[in-house]
């Protein structure tokens, strides 16, 4: 597995289809060996429903549902524990981070860096 994208999900059910679309478009430019890990932090919006729909349509998406709201850091940690990628991207679910930036970050990583990060 080349890339794992770990996304804690809370309060962004409506953004998930667009997030998935943009991620798959971006990641497919880099490799076909990727996974998207969506960790539902027991969101009251019932984001889990949307995660299940996306998982059923795309085998590269893995969904995990936490039994209660543990918070963003623990949701990220749960996703990291399940990730298999050589490179791991952590991003928010509300599209405040551009999925398209992953392409640029990955290209920079291929120059021999151990860690690559972006800021706005």
For each predicted feature, which ranges?
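Structured catalytic core of nucleotide-sugar glycosyltransferases
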Residues: 1-120
């Amino acid at each position: 597995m080349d890339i794992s994208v770990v996304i804690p999900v809370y309060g962004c059910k409506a953004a998930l289809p667009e997030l998935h679309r943009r991620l798959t478009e971006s990641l497919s430019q880099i490799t076909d060996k990727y996974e998207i890990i969506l960790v539902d932090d027991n969101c009251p919006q019932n984001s889990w429903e949307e995660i299940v729909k996306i998982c059923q349509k795309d085998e590269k998406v893995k969904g995990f549902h936490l039994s209660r709201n543990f918070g963003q850091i623990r949701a990220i940690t749960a996703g990291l524990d399940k990730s298999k990628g050589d490179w791991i991207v952590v991003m928010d679910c509300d599209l405040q981070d551009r999925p398209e930036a992953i392409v640029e970050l990955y290209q920079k990583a291929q120059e021999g860096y151990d860690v690559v990060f972006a800021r706005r």
